[in-house]
From Swiss-Prot:
Disruption phenotype: Pale yellow green leaf phenotype. Reduced levels of plastid ribosomes and defects in plastid mRNA metabolism. Keywords: Chloroplast, DNA-binding, Plastid, Transcription, Transcription regulation, Transit peptide. Its main location: plastid. This is Protein PLASTID REDOX INSENSITIVE 2, chloroplastic. Required for the activity of the plastid-encoded RNA polymerase (PEP) and full expression of genes transcribed by PEP. Signal peptide: none annotated. It comes from the Eukaryota. It is found in: Plastid, Chloroplast stroma, Chloroplast nucleoid. GO terms for cellular component: chloroplast nucleoid. InterPro entries: PRIN2 (IPR039349). GO terms for biological process: regulation of gene expression.
Length: 173
């Protein structure tokens, strides 16, 4: 009974939520028969979590939204800014983490970031973690020190600047 009331209340509040199946039993069974058939298991008063379909989300047309293509000029400019920042940032921590390998680490990070911006970055919401994992992996593979610190510095810069610079470049504020 409580389940039916809960479903009715949910449908009344949001008619877009409709159950795919009913949570209530299909045949009418007395409570005594139900407890006997369930082997003395007690049922909680909570409604079962049926599968609900949100038609509003299903029909919202998310498939129709297309991110813009990458902009090569933007990628080139942003890669240049990234290189400058990484060289400056890693130079600050040279003694602690990177030693004499700052330039090599900056080259690895810049190459990966540039490739990502040229091929995969399509505006706000498309900055992925993969290039930063690739940076860390490549630095480690080459036997260079400070892979986690370099990747962390790259992520911090990208989160702060890339989407903001894209909006300024395209005029979308």
């Amino acid at each position: 009974m409580a389940t039916r009331a809960w479903v009715a209340a949910a449908v009344a509040l949001n008619p877009q939520l409709l159950p795919l199946r009913s949570c209530s039993p299909t045949k009418s069974v007395s409570p005594a028969q139900r407890s006997a058939s369930m082997g003395l298991r007690l049922r909680s008063g909570r409604p079962c979590l049926g599968k609900f379909v949100c038609r509003r989300a299903k029909n919202a047309g998310y498939e129709d939204y297309k991110f813009p293509d990458p902009i090569p000029e933007f990628a080139e400019q942003e890669t240049s800014k990234f290189r400058e920042h990484m060289a400056w940032r890693l130079e600050q921590k040279k003694e602690d983490y990177f030693g004499d390998h700052v330039e090599e680490i900056v080259d690895v990070c810049t190459e990966i970031m540039g490739t990502f911006l040229e091929n995969d970055y399509r505006g706000p919401g498309t900055l992925l973690v993969h290039p930063f994992l690739d940076m860390k992996g490549e630095i480690k593979e080459r036997g260079l020190p400070g892979a986690p610190q370099a990747a962390r510095a790259a992520i911090a810069w990208a989160e702060k600047n890339v989407d903001k610079d894209w909006k300024a470049w395209t005029g979308e504020y």
